[in-house]
């Protein structure tokens, strides 16, 4: 078995240490380590984190391979420091059966760049009318534990209650895309001053907040787990904070773009800023950062949503919603959370590795950097500064809102069970 010696890495941002990998496992962590025949990686004070875990990606395969494939998506994930991603169910066909989730799971196994855990649809065809084969997907080779109709809201309260009751039997979780559909008909951006000035249909905060309020109460009533996807408003933060104070089993995520970007960018009418949920106000952005720091929001998830050029190179109203995010996520978190003093690197690891793996019941990821643990690791050059150029992305799509923007930090190495998937910032 191959050995790799990472020399002088700041484990979780602490004092420099050496980490010896033997095969798929961390063999030793300490100072002055040596190993005969080992490949040496000189970390030179770079930050060593457990491999990142993304609870919310859209890999588009099967059905929209023009946007992304499991292979290109996992290459993008590895480039961004991720060793595991959860793939949303809004594919063609929809991942609402054991057969489709097993297909996605097997494609992930074949890619070899990171682990892929499929998310099963809550309802058949994402239509919100009939529960999918939740038990069959859980019992399949893919072992699905997270279920979501993401892209659409499970807006029927009875269906949502039944889903929560069903997944409770095997410790699963329903991940809700909180968007009351009637309140967002014709909506194009956040409802507020900017939407009024631009004459674009407004997307009110209450459309998100009302669903979250309903679903945390349903979860309390059923005694089940609910996860709220991509929180985007200060009001949503307050509802989740209240629910947690009552002991309700709710977790929540925020995307990197909602930690940095605001609806003021929509004044450009550039569809790259069109996303669901929409970019909100500066007040919302600051509330989301504080909530991520204090634990009200549990994790960062990218909501990586690739689209081909033609789906974004059009007028605003006709453009698809979504942004790619796997290759820039850690940099945005460094800028918004670490460099502002809201989180240290141990806190980043907790929110981008440990907790996502825990919420998704994913074994072998989000583990301590210690002897005997799986060697899923990410090495980050936090001193690096660079301008985002989507031409260099591993993703098949280029719809990033950060093109031309300087961001800090760069993943130099990613290790999946002891095998380097990224070396010196390039895919291995």
Which role fits each region the language model picked out?
Residues 1-50:
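Histidine-rich, glycine-flanked metal-binding segment
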Residues 9, 24, 45, 56, ...:
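Divalent metal-coordination and catalytic microenvironments
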Residues 46-111:
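Metal-associated gating/positioning segment near the N- to mid-region
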Residues 55-68, 89-91, 96, 117-130, ...:
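Active-site mouth loops of central-metabolism enzymes
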Residues 106-122:
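A glycine-rich helix N-cap at a beta->alpha junction
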Residues 131-300:
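Histidine/acidic residue-rich metal-binding segments in metalloenzymes
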Residues 197-225, 272, 293, 298-300, ...:
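His/Asp/Glu-enriched, well-ordered alpha-helical/loop segment
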Residues 315-318, 371-426:
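C-terminal cap of metal-dependent C-N hydrolases
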